[in-house]
Amino acid sequence: MKTDGGNTWRASHSKPLNTANTMGEPFSHSEYSVHADQSEFYLNELTEHSGQDNPCMNTSRLNTNRYGHPVVHPCPKIHCICTQSNIAAIGSDCTGCVDIAQACKMLRGGQGCTQDPCVKNPHTQCFTDVSNHAMRNVLPLNVSNTEQFPIQIEYANGRNPVLNPMDDLAMRAALLLSKDIDLQNTHILPSTRISIEKNIPVAAGLAGGSADAAAVLLGINSAWQTNYSRCDLLGKAGALGADVPFLIWGGAAYGSGTGSCVTFFETQTLYWVLCFSKHPLSTRKVFQELDRQRSGAGCNHHPVFSNPAECAEMLKKAIKRGPEALAALLHNDLTSAAKMLMPEIAERIKAAERCPGILRAIISGSGPTLALLAEDAEAANRACSILKDTGVICKAVSSPAYSSIYWQT
């Protein structure tokens, strides 16, 4: 493991690189862009030099990957809908490949697409909720056979949030799949460079690092053609952190145990306002404070969430009924600990809930970011404007609707 100026991690591998794939052809250069945020990942293949101008039109994909392993569901639309759309593919792991009309239907919450599908001119309006969704880190992932180090991770904005490479979840995710390839006794490991553009604030309770890890798992799985399904990746993601499995899929979900057991819910579009703090809050310190508080006498868990099975059912029903019902259930056990470490959070929550149309304000993750649930898009934008006038840094976002068919891909 080597570092370059604190902004780039480079990891070598125990086996030599091979510049040819198992079919005896030069290793193709593929460039991927992985968009990661706290609720979704969209993988879009930008270019693939496979003898065809448009990979969407490529109908001659082989039934084995570059490691010689069989591809169970070969599909001409693997990875992308269109190279010009900058919109993520459905079925990027090739377990649920669909045509564009079906992709539109999925991303519009099962409403279907009213226009004729066209590979060369996809209906970008069908993806409005997706393309405009929230904040995301962007991880361009380049694969070639010319780099000295098989795995390189660099931070595009010149700031590496961690000092130790093994504390970097993105690097740990890359090495996790690298180790799997080693165990499969293959001698082919393509050089991979990942440049992370951090747009999600660090130490803000928004799972930005975990989102990066999940995006790396998805991107490398596709780029290296290791052919793990998302269910396979979900199981592996648990080794990286409790919230990484959820981020493999995104959407709305209930996690239990250590986070590896995830139950997904169908949702309608929800509107939120994210309020940021100028100061970070250490997740480790928040949990330490929570442990201290819970070690005291008379400490009880929130009654609504004391029974996992009941909790999942209550959330499912509330989400179906709408934002008002969901707001009544919103709670974060870390709130008291975060308030103890950053007392101004309490006043920020009160100020946020005074905004018309804001149904509930809670801290996101371990804080200090606040997540404000709004009754509709107008209320979210109005609250954002009001809070900005008081000096609060905030952003109105929406979470797309999800139908059950999304998680079948």
UniProtKB/Swiss-Prot annotation:
Active site: D243
One Pfam entry name: GHMP_kinases_C
A biological-process GO annotation: terpenoid biosynthetic process
Positions contributing to ATP binding: P201, V202, A203, A204, G205, L206, A207, G208, G209, S210, A211
Name under which the protein is recorded: 4-diphosphocytidyl-2-C-methyl-D-erythritol kinase
Family of this protein: Belongs to the GHMP kinase family. IspE subfamily.
Protein's organism: Tropheryma whipplei (strain TW08/27) (Whipple's bacillus)
Coiled-coil residue spans: none
Enzyme Commission number(s) from the entry: 2.7.1.148
Function according to Swiss-Prot or TrEMBL: Catalyzes the phosphorylation of the position 2 hydroxy group of 4-diphosphocytidyl-2C-methyl-D-erythritol.
